[in-house]
């Protein structure tokens, strides 16, 4: 599990909450006090919850699950995109499109259109069109890529969502809750931690704090992937063990072992299209 110390959190400003007049009383257990009308978050409470959240992310990745990184506010976009790409997970950094989860079937159609336009631009199709048609198709591609480019390889609903600001991403969280998708999120002093499954009490605005969260989440995912069992190796060991029990001392043919593909995780049921 990625180790983030309390000192690192202090240096990143994780302990600075919002103004006291905007606080949510349900965050009281995680607030140390106030300084200059700003709530101070108790990092002694944050650290264990942070570790629990990272362990959960790691367990998802170890089972070859998918974690959707979500951060559409300006201070989170760059870090979320960079770290999601580093751990090869889907992400969204522009405006959340209503129905991205609950109407996933329609979203996949839009993604298919994006891939179609990308292919047309590289296979010579655009060269056969007149200039104004090409400009129109490129604008369409750019618009689709801005909103869906980060999830174009996400072929099924995610197994979990990692969120930076639950107020900014409230629609996404409602959709995830409706579908039973676990939400791991940074929760500042002005929100209700009960809205998510794994709450991390902390500043959700400071760029350094957001970088710390995103980097740790990506590290947790990479650690989980590294710990995932290699199905080919497991099968070879099982084959050899069975052969040993029969007293024949046979070994699994290397070719068969390497050709054995990992079982894909069961696809989450698609929600019916919204009316």
From Swiss-Prot:
Presence of the UniProt keyword Ribosomal protein in the record: yes
Disordered, as annotated region: 226-275
PROSITE patterns associated with the record: RIBOSOMAL_S2_1 (PS00962), RIBOSOMAL_S2_2 (PS00963)
Keywords of this entry: Ribonucleoprotein, Ribosomal protein
One GO CC annotation: cytosolic small ribosomal subunit
A Pfam family reported for this protein in Swiss-Prot or TrEMBL: Ribosomal_S2
Regions of compositional bias (Low complexity) in chain numbering: 264-275
Entry's Gene Ontology molecular function annotations: structural constituent of ribosome
GO biological process, one term: translation
Domain of life of the organism encoding this protein: Bacteria
RNA-binding recorded as keyword: no
InterPro entries hit by this protein: Ribosomal_uS2, Ribosomal_uS2_bac/mit/plastid, Ribosomal_uS2_CS, Ribosomal_uS2_flav_dom_sf
HAMAP family: Ribosomal_uS2_B
PANTHER family referenced in this protein's UniProt entry, alphabetically: 30S RIBOSOMAL PROTEIN S2 PROKARYOTIC AND ORGANELLAR, SMALL RIBOSOMAL SUBUNIT PROTEIN US2M
Family of this protein: Belongs to the universal ribosomal protein uS2 family.
Protein name per its UniProtKB record: Small ribosomal subunit protein uS2
Organism name: Xanthomonas campestris pv. campestris (strain B100)
Highest classification ranks of the organism: Bacteria, Pseudomonadati, Pseudomonadota, Gammaproteobacteria, Lysobacterales
């Amino acid at each position: 599990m990625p180790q983030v110390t309390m000192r690192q959190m202090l240096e990143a400003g994780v302990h600075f909450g919002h103004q006291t007049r905007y606080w949510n009383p349900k965050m009281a257990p995680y607030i140390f006090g106030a300084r200059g009308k700003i709530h101070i978050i108790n990092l002694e409470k944050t650290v264990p919850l942070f570790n629990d959240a990272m362990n959960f992310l790691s367990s998802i990745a170890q089972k070859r699950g998918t974690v959707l990184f979500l951060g559409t506010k300006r201070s989170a976009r760059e870090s979320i995109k960079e770290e999601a790409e580093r751990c090869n997970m889907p992400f969204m950094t522009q405006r959340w499109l209503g129905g991205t989860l609950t109407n996933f079937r329609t979203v996949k159609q839009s993604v298919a259109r994006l891939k179609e336009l990308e292919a047309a631009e590289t296979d010579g199709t655009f060269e056969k069109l007149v200039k104004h048609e090409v400009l129109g198709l490129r604008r369409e591609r750019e618009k689709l890529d801005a909103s869906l480019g980060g999830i174009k390889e996400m072929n099924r609903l995610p197994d979990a969502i990692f969120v930076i600001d639950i107020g900014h991403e409230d629609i996404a969280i409602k959709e995830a809750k409706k579908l039973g998708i676990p939400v791991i999120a940074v929760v500042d002093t002005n929100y209700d931690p009960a809205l998510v499954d794994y709450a991390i009490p902390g500043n959700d605005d400071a760029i350094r704090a957001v970088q710390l969260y995103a980097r740790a989440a990506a590290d947790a995912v990479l650690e989980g992937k590294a710990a995932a069992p290699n199905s080919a190796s497991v099968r070879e060991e099982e084959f050899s063990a069975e052969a040993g029990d029969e007293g024949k001392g046979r070994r699994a043919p290397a070719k068969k072992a390497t050709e054995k593909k990992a079982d894909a995780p069961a696809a989450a049921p698609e929600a019916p299209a919204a009316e």
